Amino acid sequence: MAKDRDDPAVEDPEFAFLDDSTKSSTNTAHTEEPISVADTELNTSVAEASVETSSAAAPKSSAVDTSIPWYLRQNPAARDAQKPIEIPDLPPNPPPLLKTILEYISITAGLDDLELLDLRHLDPPPALGPKLIMIIATARSEKHLHVAADGFARFLRREHGLKANAAGLLGRNELKIKLRRKAKRMRMLANVGGAVPEGNLDDGIRTGWICCTLSKIEAHPDDMHLPGDNVDEFVGFRSVNPGVNVVVQMFTEEKRVETDLETLWGGVLKTQRREGTVAEEKLKELDEDVEAQESAEVPLISRQEEETETPASPHASVIWNRVAITFLYNDTDTQHSSRTNKALVTLLADFIMSKSADDYHKDFIELSLKKVLMNQRGHTIRRKKDSEEAIRKADLVELAMA
């Protein structure tokens, strides 16, 4: 009877190797040693951990929208931490417009590394003008430098009516014209076989430095003084308007390092502070010396006053008594009785001796002495006794004054 090839129970000789491997695997499984309990627990824990990992990863995979093709999906890249915008602190008594200028330069124009130098109190003032505030900033490139300076000048003219003189700024079309002319010169040199100049040449295109000088802006109400106000008959150059000069120095990074204005003006400020400190110390020492001398003189003066509580100087009494006599003989044509003379002498002596010598004017003393001397030289007096007395007392006055 022929074997049916379609009957599954019939063994096919072509696939005999399958039966041998199956049998061998079965025999091997029967001959293996039994699995320990520890291995069973380990396999169970590993399986549970894999299940938890797959369950945790399932929401992430489900979160991805499969309707968007892979080439349109946006993978959030790790962005670099941006540096916060740093605006320098305002100096004491700042102009009202200074904060607006700093915010525009830093935020709108996008210049970096701002530094503010307060040069308002420099003596003598800088060449850029008295009461100067200097701002130094860095641009990212040559093009950024010119765009920022041009926008800054237009902003000041449009918003605040200020005219900024931007030295080194190239206009919007001027840069293209200069580059075209430079390329044309290079082509001409190449055609005639000339060598192209090498090195960092100043061709007037790459400046790397723009100095924006603002016109005077309004000063703080507490900062309205002018240089030389405390000097009588001031001689020199200064502006009458009590404003503040602001200068913005814009650099590329390489040019700023090369120029190094911070070190220059920082040294000037340090020198002025050092000189001011030395002057203040000297004034303080001088004040202390004066106070010490005054404190030492006070007990000495009080001691001298205690010791000199005596009557007035005899010379002073002689002088003022002789001045009283001149009232008796100030008019040679007038006759006085003895009673009148005695009363006048008593009144004038009491009045004059009750005052100090400093209370009388020098002109009065000189006039009185002149009249006494005139009487001494021979003016006629009615009574001989009075004449001799007047001459003797006039001699005493002249001797005391000598």
Curated annotation (Swiss-Prot):
Specify the domain of life of the species encoding this protein: Eukaryota
Keyword vocabulary terms for this entry: Membrane, Mitochondrion, Mitochondrion inner membrane, Transit peptide
Feature: transit peptide: 1-32
Pfam families on file: RsfS
- GO terms under cellular component: mitochondrial inner membrane
Q: Which topology term describes how it sits in the membrane? A: Peripheral membrane protein
**Disordered as annotated region, ranges:** 1-60
PANTHER family xrefs: ATPASE SYNTHESIS PROTEIN 25, MITOCHONDRIAL
Family label: Belongs to the ATP25 family.
Its name, as the record gives it, is ATPase synthesis protein 25, mitochondrial
